[in-house]
């Protein structure tokens, strides 16, 4: 049986439950860069929303919530630094976990008028979220709006997958406990498309210098 993988939480959890059994082996973070496949109902805009695309994803495992949050913050900072190094005008926003589940997540959006997602933010505070999360914000009418292209997403999954798949570790007291999990993804193919949407003119593409194939074309 051969399956196309849209995402790999279950696959990684299955590997970890066979290989990790002690708190001494944690925390640990696995990552990969490979092709993903998703049954998009309406694939469009080239590699912006395709059924096949290149993605970097990673999955971290932890003994407790503080350990998970520490790694989550590191990944948030790392993703921000990656997008800054590329030269993208982006914003990290609070997001809904959706079908993946868990307790908290952030999306990273390249700002572009052609973006599929509506984002809202406050000019007075550091609040920023996608419009779905901001539905019940007390000052929603005062929030500014913009559009973005999602190029990254990070999640605190907690024990959603480990409990369902019985992925456990033995703690300091010799008792079995479910692993806590985080997952983190960057759409490698979509970054290129988003950079084009954000930076171009009537003559064509103006790539940020960090990802431009050439500095000068004659």
Residues covered by each model-derived region:
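TRNA-recognition modules of translation machinery and tRNA-sensing kinases, especially anticodon-binding
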Residues: 1-218
């Amino acid at each position: 049986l051969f399956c196309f993988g849209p995402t790999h939480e279950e696959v990684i959890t299955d590997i970890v439950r066979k290989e990790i059994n002690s708190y001494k082996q944690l925390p640990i973070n696995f990552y990969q860069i490979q092709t993903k496949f998703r049954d998009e109902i309406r694939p469009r805009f080239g590699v912006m929303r395709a059924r096949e695309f290149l993605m970097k994803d990673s999955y971290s495992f932890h003994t407790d919530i503080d350990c998970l949050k520490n790694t989550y913050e590191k990944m948030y900072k790392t993703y921000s630094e990656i997008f800054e190094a590329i030269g993208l005008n982006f914003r990290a926003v609070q997001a809904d976990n959706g079908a993946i589940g868990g307790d908290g997540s952030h999306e990273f959006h390249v700002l572009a008028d052609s973006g599929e997602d509506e984002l809202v933010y406050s000019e007075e505070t550091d609040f920023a979220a996608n419009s779905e999360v901001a539905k019940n914000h007390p000052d929603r009418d005062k929030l500014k709006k913009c559009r973005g292209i999602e190029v990254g997403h990070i999640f605190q999954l907690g024990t959603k997958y480990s409990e369902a798949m019985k992925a456990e570790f033995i703690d300091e007291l010799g008792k079995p406990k479910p692993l806590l999990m985080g997952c983190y993804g960057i759409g490698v193919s979509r970054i290129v498309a988003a950079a084009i949407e954000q930076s171009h003119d009537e003559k064509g593409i103006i790539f940020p210098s960090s990802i431009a194939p050439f500095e000068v074309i004659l």
